[in-house]
Amino acid sequence: EMRDPRFEEFVKKAKIRILDDEVMLIDDAFYLVGRKDAQKPGDGTKNRIEPEVILSGLDKAKPIIVLEHQPKQLKELETSGADMQLCGHTHDGQMFPGNLTVKLMWENACGYLKKGNLHSIVTSGVGVWGPAMRVGTDCEICPITIHFQG
């Protein structure tokens, strides 16, 4: 199953660039790294580039922010020089008892975690997966203020 062509058309018309294992240098100040979605092997994103490969060659003096659907590969991102990983995916378990068991599946299931020099932020998001309901979790939009040092 590939991405919905209507989505592709919308993204193109809106001039949105999807970063599928791609890097953008923003204003020569910091990097945005978009990862392919590991959960969607049928949409053409099965073969993801490993963190050490996608981050190699980047100027590590500049902040590196990784955008990822799932909070995966924290250790690999940290050892490869990423400064921050921003994720969704977990919905913080969405419904009881998932909100209790999700913490067994992910090192950072929801919230903030510092792993070495990597700052990982995972939101429960505003959407749902499967049934359109939440029990025992909250929807959230997480405002983040980043101050670059150095």
What are these regions (language model features)?
Residues 1-150:
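Soluble catalytic domains of enzymes that build or remodel membrane lipids, polysaccharides, and related
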